[in-house]
Structures are given as structure tokens and as C-alpha cells.
A protein has these predicted regions:
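Hydrophobic residues at beta-strand termini and immediately following loops
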Residues: 35, 128, 161
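Short histidine/acidic/glycine/proline-rich micro-motifs that form metal-
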Residues: 10-14, 132-136, 166-168
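Short, glycine-/small-residue-rich phosphate/pyrophosphate-handling segment
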Residues: 111-153
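Short, well-ordered alpha-helical segments in soluble proteins
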Residues: 98-101, 105, 129, 153
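Glycine-rich phosphate/pyrophosphate-binding loop and the adjoining helix
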Residues: 136, 144-192
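N-terminal beta1-alpha1-beta2 submodule of the flavodoxin-like/Rossmannoid cofactor-binding fold
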Residues: 1-103, 182-192
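A structural micro-motif
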Residues: 2, 30, 123, 155-156
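Conserved nucleotide-sugar donor-interacting segment of glycosyltransferase catalytic cores
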Residues: 103-113
Length: 192
């Protein structure tokens, strides 16, 4: 059975991003494991935690809780990441979580030539986002995650579903969300 990891980085009740993500998940078949980033209360990595992680990695000891998120991410068949567009990217809690996922010898390794090589099982990552205004000229939150997925994690395909301009005066929010759901439906019809 397909193992789907759903990373929920939506802190608000009634999140429109979460609404779109749930719509996508309703199309998918498999076992969904949901991780709600804001409930994890992760602290940024610091000198002490980085030294601990480096030492554990050097000793090939990956039993420590610091590797929990990397192991969870690496074993998933498909990733669904939902994050609102905040301050030109995504909520800071997601960046902190990504730092935990960036664990050498679990989600990636370096080749002899010092290039990253992905170790993740997933072949596809879906990124779901909404924005009150335009994401100008590109969605930098998605671009960042896309870069990590392809360059470090070895996930060859990333897909962005986004609804923009939801808070613009006079915007038909329901129509914008409906169009985004239709894009998900069309994608799923053509690629499932």
C-alpha cells in the first residue's frame, strides 16, 4: 500500500491551503500519515544540536530522536506538503522542520565528488499553497522545496497547486478555490 506523508504546515483554523490539500488527499489511494508541523514545537538547530547530529551521523547511529523526521520523510512513497504563502515563502516552522529532514545518510548523501545524491523513496512531491495576493514572479516557497526535493532528496517530480489573490478586494474567493480544486481534479484524471 502506498505510504503518503502529509506535512501540514497550516497554522490557522479554516485554512484555505489545508482545504486544497484535503481535496488532493481525497483523490489519493494509500495510507496517509499526517504530521502537523505546528504541533511538533520544533526548535531551530543550534551549535549543540548540530554537533550532536554530526557525531551521531559519523557513528552511523540514527536511533536518536533528532533523526525522526528525516526517517519518516525518507520512507514515504509520496509527499504532500501544504503551506500558506507567507513573507514570500512559507511559515518559519516549515523551514525548521526541513532542517531536521536534511539529515546526511538518511535523506541524502554526498558522492565522492561532493555532489548531493538523494536517498528518499518518494518519486513525487505535491506542494499545496494559497496566497492572499500574487506570488510574484514565482512561488519562492515552492522553488525552495523543489530545489531540495530534486537536488538533495532525489525526488524527481514536484507539482505545485496554488490559489492566489484570495484577499484582494473584490476577489471571488470561492471561485478561485474552486478553480484550484478543478486543476487538482484535472491533474489527477490525467496522471492517476
Amino acid at each position: 500500500m502506498e505510504q503518503i506523508l502529509f506535512i501540514n504546515a497550516c497554522p490557522r483554523e479554516g485554512s484555505r491551503t489545508l482545504e486544497l490539500a484535503r481535496h488532493l488527499l481525497s483523490k489519493m489511494e494509500g495510507s496517509v500519515e499526517e504530521l502537523t508541523i505546528f504541533e511538533e514545537n520544533l526548535l531551530p538547530l543550534n551549535g549543540k544540536t548540530l554537533a550532536l547530529r554530526d557525531k551521531m551521523t559519523a557513528n552511523q547511529n540514527f536511533d536518536h530522536p533528532i533523526f525522526k523526521y528525516a526517517k519518516q520523510f525518507a520512507k514515504a512513497d509520496t509527499i504532500v506538503l501544504a503551506a500558506p504563502f507567507w513573507d514570500l515563502s512559507f511559515p518559519s516552522a516549515l523551514k525548521i522542520w526541513l532542517e531536521y529532514v536534511m539529515a546526511k545518510e538518511i535523506t541524502f548523501r554526498y558522492t565522492k565528488e561532493s555532489f548531493p545524491c538523494g536517498l528518499c523513496k518518494a518519486k513525487k512531491l505535491f506542494y499545496i499553497s494559497t496566497a492572499g495576493g500574487p506570488t510574484l514572479p514565482s512561488h519562492m516557497g515552492f522553488s525552495y522545496v523543489d530545489g531540495l526535493a530534486k537536488s538533495y532528496f532525489g525526488i524527481p517530480e514536484t507539482v505545485l497547486f496554488s490559489a492566489e489573490n484570495l484577499d484582494v478586494v473584490g476577489a471571488d474567493t470561492a471561485a478561485i478555490l474552486s478553480k484550484a480544486k478543478e486543476e487538482i481534479d484535472n491533474y489527477w484524471r490525467d496522471h492517476a
